[in-house]
Amino acid sequence: MLCILILLLHPRLCPVTKGGLGKPSGDIYTALFGAPCDCKGGTQTNNYATPTYTQVTDCGDKNAYLTYDTNWNGVSSPKWLCVRKPPSIPVINGRPGPCPSECTNNIKSQMHSSCYSSFSQCTQGNNTYFTAILQRTKSTSETNPVTSGLQPHGVLQAGCDGTVGKSVCWNQQAPIHVSDGGGPQDAVRELYVQKQIELVIQSQFPKLSYHPLARSKPRGPDIDAQMLDILSATHQALNISNPSLAQNCWLCLNQGTSMPLAFPVNISSFNASQNNCTPSLPFRVQPMPSQVYPCFFKGAQNNSFDIPVGVANFVNCSSSSNHSEALCPGPGQAFVCGNNLAFTALPANWTGSCVLAALLPDIDIISGDDPVPIPTFDYIAGRQKRAVTLIPLLVGLGVSTAVATGTAGLGVAVQSYTKLSHQLINDVQALSSTINDLQDQLDSLAEVVLQNRRGLDLLTAEQGGICLALQERCCFYANKSGIVRDKIKNLQEDLEKRRKALADNLFLTGLNGLLPYLLPFLGPLFAIILFFSFAPWILRRVTALIRDQLNSLLGKPIQIHYHQLATRDLEYGRL
């Protein structure tokens, strides 16, 4: 027992041995394969292709790769192979520099983003292109094809054409219905579509110019009126579909930009002739995985007026209806097209494939009976505590519930409760001061109004007063400022009592505020003291009991009883 206590109290006395399955240190690699920048495996100068490697080290103008080769004997010893970095393209007068010599009269129309590690911009003639070092080749492929009586259509995945390790250049804008896998060409297409939609909106609704003094201020982090309307509508819909849940629930919004949910709907009720919708900029949504639904399709005209909205690849199109005119969705619906972008209206020159979907706000619903998750303190004094990850919000500020969060949770909860109480008192105090200031302004305004009323009555005295002159009912001012001031005074007195009660509470202010933090440790400390106090007495009592039992067993005399045995001679004598 004593050795265990010494080891627990003095952990530094024990030798520490580290082990694991991590990679070896750099010294071991240097001893086995040499310094990386020495390039013992050679320097690759004919191209800039990245070899197969396990580690890479930056050596300034080149990168050192720890490569390995495979042959019929197995894997050879790794070596550091150096590959020189491609020359960077400088920026001259705000424009990218000239393209590499390999790109002369060899500009590609498309390039998949998986075929290069990084890209930059270059200029050739009066045009700007993307350029990169080609790492692999790839052929063009088609995804999500639809053949429902119309011409097959889908999104084409761009290929990679060129020599591996050499520079390639390609256009900034890919051909229509060709995707580079989320690379720069897809980003340029999204910006182009957004700009074209802005032009359509400006042509229908001219932009108003405001005076700088009349320009509205940007909204802060508070919830605006539109979001409150969305929350109200969501609660009304929930009240209709699930009244029991709507009676007591939380409606939770995600932080940051909200992405609505998109559910594909049937187009049986769609009316292609309606054109009373208002276009807006496309916004990103979260399409829900769904089954087969009909799609809207319009082929490309192969001219500069086409607006490629992309191809909806999150749903399998059961059929495809061809439309050559502008389309408007129904109320509460939108067209979801490529890259999960939703359009409230499709212009006449759109091209691509879209799905009609209903939009719902991204709101999480938590029942009022369930606990609302809040963060917990997992690390106290450098040691990780066993704490409940999710605790109720309304009960988590109390003392009893905080015991479940660990030994340190009680002190933190009590201190947090104290700070919250002070904060609430200060907030209510500030609110009462604000109401008092508003009441002063109202009193001043009332005095001005009464003065104006008396002046108007004097001016219209010959006509019987202002009321007869206007042929209206006379209005009189009912001054209730005294009632408001009395309520504010009572509120301030109550706040002062609460502040004094918190200050006089020894449980919260004892030992200069350290008592709430010491209380969690007093229980275990008191238990340890009781254990070491009564353990010797209990040990003595048990030892004495065992000794008495042994003595009583060993002290008893051994009694031997003799009995006369019958012999066979006596039996024969009787005979």
Curated annotation (Swiss-Prot):
Extracellular topological segments: 20-517
Coiled coil spans: 411-461, 471-507
Alphabetized UniProt keyword annotations: Cleavage on pair of basic residues, Coiled coil, Disulfide bond, Fusion of virus membrane with host cell membrane, Fusion of virus membrane with host membrane, Glycoprotein, Host cell membrane, Host membrane, Host-virus interaction, Membrane, Signal, Transmembrane, Transmembrane helix, Viral attachment to host cell, Viral envelope protein, Viral penetration into host cytoplasm, Virion, Virus entry into host cell
Transmembrane segments: 518-538
Gene3D superfamilies xrefs: 1.10.287.210
Cytoplasmic side: 539-575
Positions of region (Immunosuppression): 450-466
Site entry (Cleavage), positions: 386-387, 560-561
GO cellular component term, pick one: viral envelope
InterPro entries xrefs: TLV/ENV_coat_polyprotein (IPR018154)
Signal peptide, first to last residue: 1-19
GO biological process: fusion of virus membrane with host plasma membrane; symbiont entry into host cell; virion attachment to host cell
Extent of motif YXXL motif: 562-565
PTM summary: Specific enzymatic cleavages in vivo yield mature proteins. Envelope glycoproteins are synthesized as an inactive precursor that is N-glycosylated and processed likely by host cell furin or by a furin-like protease in the Golgi to yield the mature SU and TM proteins. The cleavage site between SU and TM requires the minimal sequence [KR]-X-[KR]-R. The CXXC motif is highly conserved across a broad range of retroviral envelope proteins. It is thought to participate in the formation of a labile disulfide bond possibly with the CX6CC motif present in the transmembrane protein. Isomerization of the intersubunit disulfide bond to an SU intrachain disulfide bond is thought to occur upon receptor recognition in order to allow membrane fusion.
Keyword Coiled coil in annotation: yes
Motif (CXXC): 249-252
Motif (CX6CC): 467-475
Residues annotated as glycosylated: 126, 239, 266, 271, 302, 316, 322, 349, 479
Domain of life: Viruses
Segments for region (Fusion peptide): 390-410
Disulfide topology: 249-252, 249-475, 467-474
Function according to Swiss-Prot or TrEMBL: The surface protein (SU) attaches the virus to the host cell by binding to its receptor. This interaction triggers the refolding of the transmembrane protein (TM) and is thought to activate its fusogenic potential by unmasking its fusion peptide. Fusion occurs at the host cell plasma membrane. The transmembrane protein (TM) acts as a class I viral fusion protein. Under the current model, the protein has at least 3 conformational states: pre-fusion native state, pre-hairpin intermediate state, and post-fusion hairpin state. During viral and target cell membrane fusion, the coiled coil regions (heptad repeats) assume a trimer-of-hairpins structure, positioning the fusion peptide in close proximity to the C-terminal region of the ectodomain. The formation of this structure appears to drive apposition and subsequent fusion of viral and target cell membranes.
Record text on subunit structure and interactions: The mature envelope protein (Env) consists of a trimer of SU-TM heterodimers attached by a labile interchain disulfide bond.
Free-text note regarding domains: The YXXL motif is involved in determining the exact site of viral release at the surface of infected mononuclear cells and promotes endocytosis. The 17 amino acids long immunosuppressive region is present in many retroviral envelope proteins. Synthetic peptides derived from this relatively conserved sequence inhibit immune function in vitro and in vivo.
Protein name: Envelope glycoprotein
Native source species: Squirrel monkey retrovirus (SMRV-H)
